[in-house]
Amino acid sequence: MWFLPAALPLLPLLLLLGQAPPSRPQSLGTMKLRLVGPGSGPEEGRLEVLHQGQWGTVCDDDFALQEATVACRQLGFEGALTWAHSAKYGSGEGPIWLDNVHCVGTESSLDQCGSNGWGVSDCTHSEDVGVVCNPQRHRGSVSERVSNALGPQDRRLEEVRLKPILASAKRQSPVTEGAVEVKYEGHWRQVCDQGWTRNNSRVVCGMLGFPSEAPVDSHHYRKVWDSKMKDPNSRLKSLTKKNSFWIHRVNCLGTEPHMANCQVQVAPAQGKLRPACPGGMHAVVSCVAGPRFRPPKAKPGRKESRAEEMKVRLRSGAQVGEGRVEVLMNRQWGTVCDHGWNLISASVVCRQLGFGSAREALFGAQLGQALGPIHLSEVRCRGYERTLSDCPSLEGSQNGCQHDNDAAVRCNIPNMGFQDQVRLAGGRSPEEGVVEVQVEVNGVQRWGAVCSDHWGLSEAMVACRQLGLGFASHAIKDTWYWQGTPGAREVVMSGVHCSGTELALQQCQRHGPVHCSHGTGRFSAGVSCTDSAPDLVMNAQLVQETAYLEDRPLSLLYCAHEENCLSQSADRMDWPYGHRRLLRFSSQIHNLGRADFRPKMGRHGWIWHQCHRHYHSIEVFTHYDLLTLNGSKVAEGHKASFCLEDTNCPTGMQRRYACANFGEQGVTVGCWDTYRHDIDCQWVDITDVGPGDYIFQVVVNPKFEVAESDFSNNMMRCRCKYDGQRVWLHNCHTGDSYRANTELSQEQEQRLRNNLI
């Protein structure tokens, strides 16, 4: 980050926020810290603490940016850029001294923060936390002057908001224009407009979830201000005479992700002897909302091409504006390595996508891993760039990045007020219950229930997102065991149908007049939310490498016929004479999410399959289809049901799920379930299909029976050439790995190279 040099006459009264309270000398605390491990510089590494003469580690449970900020300041840096969980910088040795550390963010030492106590932990060294500090260090003389002048070390800017002044601004949602108010030491203050710049406005807008700022009609606002100052009964007039009403001066470069990183002068240089903001008024800011948050018929801030919008995207985030960062290069989507990843680069991504600045820059695949290429590493944005492609970077393959280094972001988004229009009632925890919404009924805002007709996982996902509770683990249609809020049990919303991308249930399609076939009561919609979810992805390359044709005798297909794994024409054959032509392949399904994939049904619902000699826990886990080029189905796999297990896991990770002996079923995070090409029903029966060009398609979790953090990567497609005797699969890829308008041309090129046309 970059800071303007402080003017020496103002040093006693400057608050350099974001570098936060200046660090005190190490001797003032009883705790010593160090950073160790394979970091790229002295500002990052595994965090270790010296206690009772022995170095130990800190567990990553509940560790977040405010804890990292305290640690970095204690180490002499200006603040933290981010932190790393799961022993990114290697597992430590010795004791785990601290667990569940909780800081406000203003402390000068970690020993001033809450925790379980010295050595009280249920963690292992695989959970050792690391930090990445701002490489800029404190300058001793400046730190001492600021520290001595400010006294208590807990002064900081906490929040920023816009107070709408004009009637037109008050009617908008979100509020995009108004006077800047800053929460400082627990109280809201207004900011003097003297010296206020567009750079300051840009930072404020970014914090509020807006990608850019717009010019303000200062002359009009000045007239409004002067009229209030002339009113002898104006409360504002008396308040402005108090220095405690003002933040005297703000100076930002415009690249900062938070006003806490700007220079802020709380009071004038002469303190109480000189009034703050003499002759000035409150600073007014106008922000430009991103496309998803603009009011109807609002004009865009600038012309945005579809190509520009689609060069970066976020995946696997629970909330809008968060996710794993993926960029489009060479017509293929790939990830960004977290080496050198920080808040400034993350903010460029957020603004490019129409959000505000970055609230958090995450690394270590904290929001899940991807398959496919890693396009970028060592991204070094300055903060001025319009797109991530404008920033200096290296190729991801140049410095040993793996997908456990996938970078992610959490962006600031505007407050739309949607979270106040939904609530859960009657559940055993705050994360579950009957869904109650606030809607307008006959001109009056009322709370009521949602009809569970057609209520599914997509709708539940939107509800959990609106509540700020992450993903939906279950969409519940029968809620008789949960008592709703008295007076809110009547159904006020029915026919809800969501695509899954909406910000709120109120944005989904629904009935005009309420029509609920079940009425009220036990059939109100409910949800159970969770902060993490699995993410299943098919290994497309393995499908392409293992596909082949087999003419299998009917005498070997009795079990498969019994399980309905053959096309209907097999029923009319003279068993056991003849054969079926099968397109066989192996499928390997990876769980790249942050939670285990578990079957929806409990053990009581599992089905014993005599042919396979084990239980199947899920009715439809994947669909296998052969399609014409226009999408019509010509053949399909008929695998009746599936057993879920950890076929393989990465080195050092133990398999947890197995089909044998009525074992627990599922797919562990990081592991994969493999269905070999030579097992029963692992095929598509193409006996009745003629030669031609086709699309081979596999869809995982096709009915959305189990929640995932990302459903867009559940489809795998290949181009298929069948000449009546041989089959070729080529250009196999997950459904979202290529940009749509380049997919066809790439397939054409591949076929030309393979001499298939």
UniProtKB/Swiss-Prot annotation:
> Which co-factors does it depend on?
Cu cation; lysine tyrosylquinone residue
Keyword annotations for this protein, in alphabetical order, are: Copper, Disulfide bond, Glycoprotein, LTQ, Metal-binding, Oxidoreductase, Repeat, Secreted, Signal, TPQ
Q: Where does Cu cation bind?
A: 612, 614, 616
Q: Can you cite an annotated GO cellular component?
A: membrane
The leader peptide range reads: 1-25
Residue positions, PTM 2',4',5'-topaquinone? 675
User: How is the cofactor bound, in the record's words?
Assistant: Contains 1 lysine tyrosylquinone.
Which SUPFAM superfamilies does UniProt cross-reference here?
A: SRCR-like
Q: What is its main location?
A: secreted
Q: Catalytic activity annotated for this protein?
A: L-lysyl-[protein] + O2 + H2O = (S)-2-amino-6-oxohexanoyl-[protein] + H2O2 + NH4(+)
GO molecular function term, any single one: copper ion binding
Report the PTM annotation: The lysine tyrosylquinone cross-link (LTQ) is generated by condensation of the epsilon-amino group of a lysine with a topaquinone produced by oxidation of tyrosine. May be proteolytically cleaved by BMP1.
Cysteine disulfide links: 59-123, 72-133, 103-113, 192-277, 205-287, 252-262, 337-401, 350-411, 381-391, 451-516, 464-529, 498-508, 559-565, 611-659, 643-649, 671-681, 718-732
Q: Where is the crosslink of kind Lysine tyrosylquinone (Lys-Tyr)? A: 639-675
Q: Where in the cell is it found?
A: Secreted, Extracellular space
For site (Cleavage), what residue positions does UniProt give? 570-571
Instruction: Give the domain of life.
Output: Eukaryota
| Role noted for this protein | Catalyzes the oxidative deamination of lysine and hydroxylysine residues in collagen and elastin, resulting in the formation of covalent cross-linkages, and the stabilization of collagen and elastin fibers.
Protein name, UniProt field: Lysyl oxidase homolog 4
